[in-house]
């Protein structure tokens, strides 16, 4: 018998998303909203689905959008910044 987890569930364990009510947003080739839960809480009418987590006795809610990181390129161009690192720097400075 072999156990494992999907890429998002395994990544969530790697960044410490292991307890109920913890959540993260991951941007890459897809955009994933990932929230840890203690049980099956699917809401398909809102495009949020429930899956087994990579850890025992844990579930997660997940909603996915494809090509998500491209929105950062769009935001950089929209604001007149040269690239995504410049956008992130500007966002951090605005938050100070």
Name each region found by the language model.
Residues 1-96:
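Active-site core segments that coordinate phosphate-bearing ligands/cofactors
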């Amino acid at each position: 018998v072999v156990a494992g987890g999907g890429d998002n569930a395994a990544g969530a364990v790697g960044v410490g998303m292991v307890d109920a009510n913890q959540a993260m947003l991951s941007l890459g080739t897809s955009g994933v909203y990932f929230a840890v839960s203690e049980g099956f809480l699917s809401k398909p009418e809102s495009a949020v689905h429930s899956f087994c987590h990579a850890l025992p006795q844990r579930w997660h809610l997940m909603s996915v959008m494809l090509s998500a990181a491209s929105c950062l390129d769009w935001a950089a161009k929209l604001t007149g910044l040269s690239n995504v690192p410049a956008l992130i720097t500007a966002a951090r400075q605005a938050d100070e």
